[in-house]
Amino acid sequence: MKTSKEITINKKNKFGAEILCIGSEILLGNIVNTNSQWIAAQLAILGIPHFRQTVIGDNPARLEEAILEASNRSEILITTGGLGPTPDDIKTKVIADTFKTPLEQRNDILIDLRNKSKDKVSKLSESQKKQSLVPKGAKIINNYSGTAPGIFWSPKENFTILTFPGVPSELKEMWAKEASKLLISNNLSKEVISSKVLHFAGITESLLADKIQHLLISKNPTVATYASTGSVKVRITARGKSSEKTNRLIEPIKKELTQITGLKCFGLDNETLEEIVFKLLLKRKETIAVAESCTGGGIGSKLTKIPGSSQIFHGGVIAYNNSIKQRLLGVPEEIINTHGAVSKQVVESMARGVQIKFKVNWAISVSGIAGPTGGSKSKPVGLVNFCIKGPKTLITWEENFGSNKTREDIQKLSVLNALDRLRLSIIMAN
């Protein structure tokens, strides 16, 4: 059986890119590896297919093995981590040793290191100087925010390696300013891959898939559904020689999707429900307040994450205790005693109360049993009541999200459900 160092693959079979992330802290679960996800998205933008992601610890032998294997099956290897002045920053030396290439000290890196040092000292420590050593013949990818530069190097035919530090902000800046341009100028970018994401609420993934079954079998562009708590995403992805070509492929599919689903589609790409609600209220020059009992301020939190939210959001009351509902929102004790805190009658009274208290156009209230305790046969865990009160709108409704959900899931579903109904109510008011 051949070892990894003896593996040979015909260069014609080599294709695409792979990602290698280095760091024992990733393997141990101490930090989340967001770099791979981000790089994968950037490769897609450049039209570079990628088929493998690997994580290894700070071990020279395993690193050399991983680099050799990648060089025999892929055209491009992108690495993160393992760069810097500390003893476990071993990547550059291992890469050079793997391809039997000497390291050379780069004066331009030394000058940059001195300029970035706090006191601009002329003498650098040996650990700092280590960062100026790169394989002979490699191009430098400058690090604008940190000290450890990356390299762009083709140590063998039909194979290029790019190295980056593990700090996400440094990686992203180096990629945007230099690495992506190097990939394009060296003809490593094959085609353009463009995507458009549509967001849906108030519909399950299976029901949505049934409605768009004929689109899901499309080859270019491809159409795929992805479910998350309370919402569904549909990603349309097209390949072509230019972004103009891919956009022309995507547009008719996007148009058909929105025609089929109507108001179930609430946003595109990075748009969120709260942003859509914010824009709708801002356009109408109207305001809102919230009264929350089981969501712990989750609705208000979503709305106030948006810059400029004070233009539409006046405030809210988080009323878990019944006496707070009575004192701050004016909910009659008789209604609570007769119908219970989790009831349509109580949420309607809460919405009316917060609308008056904050002098707003719109009010939304919620009261439910998020669990894991507190449920009963008539009012189980997962039961949530809502109310929306607008200028000419009064809607109360009940949802049962199920007792098998976690407290966090029930709260999240309640927030998303409330925001989506609010979105629809404002649209209908128009």
Swiss-Prot record:
* SMART domains for this protein: MoCF_biosynth
Q: Which Gene3D superfamilies match?
A: 3.30.70.2860, CinA-like, MoaB/Mog-like domain
- Which InterPro entries does the record cross-reference, listed alphabetically? CinA, CinA-like_C, CinA_C, CinA_KH, Competence-induced_CinA, MoaB/Mog-like_dom_sf, MoaB/Mog_dom
Q: Which organism is it from?
A: Prochlorococcus marinus (strain NATL2A)
Q: What is the lineage of its organism?
A: Bacteria, Bacillati, Cyanobacteriota, Cyanophyceae, Synechococcales
Q: Which family does it belong to?
A: Belongs to the CinA family.
Q: What name is this protein filed under?
A: CinA-like protein
